[in-house]
Amino acid sequence: MESVGCCGDCRGSSVDPRSTFVLSNLAEVVERVLTFLPAKALLRVACVCRLWRECVRRVLRTHRSVTWISAGLAEASHLERHCLVRVVAEELENVRILPHTVLYMADSETFISLEECRGHKRARKRTSMETALALEKLFPKQCQVLGIVTPGIVVTPMGSGSNRPQEIEIGESGFALLFPQIEGIKIQPFHFIKDPKNLTLERHQLTEVGLLDNPELRVVLVFGYNCCKVGASNYLQQVVSTFSDMNIILAGGQVDNLSSLTSEKNPLDIDASGVVGLSFSGHRIQSATVLLNEDVSDEKTAEAAMQRLRAANIPEQNTIGFMFACVGRGFQYYRAKGNVEADAFRKFFPSVPLFGFFGNGEIGCDRIVTGNFILRKCNEVKDDDLFHSYTTIMALIHLGSSK
């Protein structure tokens, strides 16, 4: 999947000359026909002639909705490739948008081969990087790809945002969120690697990725990886504290590993620790988060939390839901009843797809950002109140009208 680039002149052939004339000269007709093609096919036909290339550009600009590719237990297998790599390779043929930014998450047990015995760290690292590279190669070269691996995955099956989301606490699974280039919205990946010799964060580092001096900043998804390493959790809190006092939505948690970040030139070190994420900027963005604390322990209290999120009145169209839960929640936490929180979300948000993970710590609080209205300003929330365990963070991100 590559960008529109080649061009030529439409030439006649043995087909009906009237059809040739229409498809060579009437842009309105060509555009109408091309709207039915997926992005990969559009990029191929863009090489037919200059007229078609310009029509392809216009058609792609109208495809602004976020798309997702998901792989759950039904797609899992014992084949050599992780199910997410296999499903992405198949489904990208039918995707209608040109991905500009991709966020993918996969289960750590199968993605990085944690079943390898001790003494085979080098083999495990190679397997992880090979899987990540295979996934990255499927996307356009100019696409920004951020990938993380976690103990468990929350995913909405493909086909419709109203499909029942699945909490997959154990097992091969994953998803890829595909963001097109959306007018008026900027999505930037960021990465801060913990360096024991230099723990200072320079202001320009934060400014370059949209985390400081950015009046349009609305949402930050932030993930600490390899936080079991000495000092890693403190470093995560240090990074978050630099922008947590702003009126933005902040959501995320601690994951096992960072597996992909194509915007960086140097290869990733699977043994390193640091902080990674995405910043979302643009006045059209609306967002809200709620915290499900330890008091939320049954269906009734979970639904009450979703009612608080629903009260934010975030539009459902072109909106994504995120669920960042502790590995200590889920099936066992709800007395052997599975999918409680995902089902509660679906009850109050019937058409919003939900994605996320079961991780090792959660970041966020109750907050709403819609235009100039802030439910709870960040400077009223202490840093300690943003970091949790045995909780779940539910978030909504609305990216404006898709029209």
Swiss-Prot record:
The modification Phosphoserine is found at residue 128. GO terms for cellular component: Z disc. Keywords: Acetylation, Cytoplasm, Phosphoprotein, Ubl conjugation pathway. Gene3D superfamilies: 1.20.1280.50. The modification N-acetylmethionine is found at residue 1. It holds the Pfam family FIST_C. GO terms for biological process: positive regulation of proteasomal ubiquitin-dependent protein catabolic process; protein polyubiquitination; regulation of skeletal muscle fiber development. Substrate-recognition component of the SCF (SKP1-CUL1-F-box protein)-type E3 ubiquitin ligase complex. Promotes the proteasome-dependent degradation of key sarcomeric proteins, such as alpha-actinin (ACTN2) and filamin-C (FLNC), essential for maintenance of normal contractile function. Directly interacts with SKP1 and CUL1. This is F-box only protein 22.
